[in-house]
Amino acid sequence: MTKSELIEKLATRQSQLSAKEVEAAIKEMLEQMADTLETGDRIEIRGFGSFSLHYRAPRTGRNPKTGTSVELEGKYVPHFKPGKELRERVDAINT
């Protein structure tokens, strides 16, 4: 599902809100989440999951085009950990 598909679906389900209002709310929510992660803080949405930053240590990688070794710097990457309710709903699909 893309962001525009999500906006369309939410606007359909929430008839009191226009698609523009839903779009503004989603954009603001995503902006706030990005700002929070940018400061190194964690985001927890109970039942859904949590977003945090994980550190990837420096390592030696490989350029897939040339095959040469490349030194990669350490960096922080966004990480999502699904909550218990979300895991259970997804597991129910698989059974």
UniProtKB/Swiss-Prot annotation:
The gene is ihfB. Pfam families: Bac_DNA_binding. GO terms for cellular component: chromosome; cytosol. InterPro entries: Hist_DNA-bd, Histone-like_DNA-bd_CS, IHF-like_DNA-bd_dom_sf, IHF_beta. PANTHER family: DNA-BINDING PROTEIN HU, INTEGRATION HOST FACTOR SUBUNIT BETA. The lineage of its organism: Bacteria, Pseudomonadati, Pseudomonadota, Gammaproteobacteria, Alteromonadales. NCBIfam families: hip, PRK00199.1. Keywords: DNA recombination, DNA-binding, Transcription, Transcription regulation, Translation regulation. SMART domains: BHL. This protein is one of the two subunits of integration host factor, a specific DNA-binding protein that functions in genetic recombination as well as in transcriptional and translational control. This is Integration host factor subunit beta. It comes from the Bacteria. One of its GO terms (molecular function) is structural constituent of chromatin. HAMAP family: IHF_beta. Heterodimer of an alpha and a beta chain. One of its GO terms (biological process) is regulation of translation. Belongs to the bacterial histone-like protein family.
